[in-house]
């Protein structure tokens, strides 16, 4: 692999993870409000710690390139589930965009899962 490809793979992981790290951190700072929003959408607020762990922890693991394929698959599934549960009012333009943003991110995660993390990752250390 060349340096450009290696750098692009790392940059891609960082960019894909950024939204999840930021979302997980914001859920910590707005914990009660997020639980209420989840409950209003029919999702038990008790699941919030798992959501935060997946968003924040999964995002950081993706950046580090640790267990990358597994994390990418988990984030792909989470992205599709989140689209279906929280952004399903496709008649609302904002929700339409959010729905397909999540679906597009799932596609990016599936590519990462299929191709692996690249050279600049903990998964490839020592190789």
Tell where the protein language model's regions lie, with residue ranges.
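Extended, low-polarity transmembrane helix blocks
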Residues: 1-29, 36, 45-53, 57, ...
């Amino acid at each position: 692999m060349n340096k450009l490809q290696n750098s692009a793979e790392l940059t891609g992981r960082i960019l894909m993870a950024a939204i999840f790290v930021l979302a997980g951190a914001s859920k910590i700072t707005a914990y009660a409000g997020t639980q209420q929003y989840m409950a209003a959408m029919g999702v038990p607020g008790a699941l919030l710690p798992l959501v935060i762990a997946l968003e924040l922890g999964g995002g950081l693991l993706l950046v580090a390139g640790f267990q990358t394929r597994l994390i990418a698959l988990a984030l792909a599934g989470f992205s599709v589930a989140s689209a279906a549960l929280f952004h399903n009012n496709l008649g609302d333009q904002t929700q339409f965009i959010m729905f397909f943003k999540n679906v597009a991110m799932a596609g990016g995660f599936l590519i990462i899962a299929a191709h692996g993390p690249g050279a600049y990752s903990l998964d490839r250390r020592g190789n």
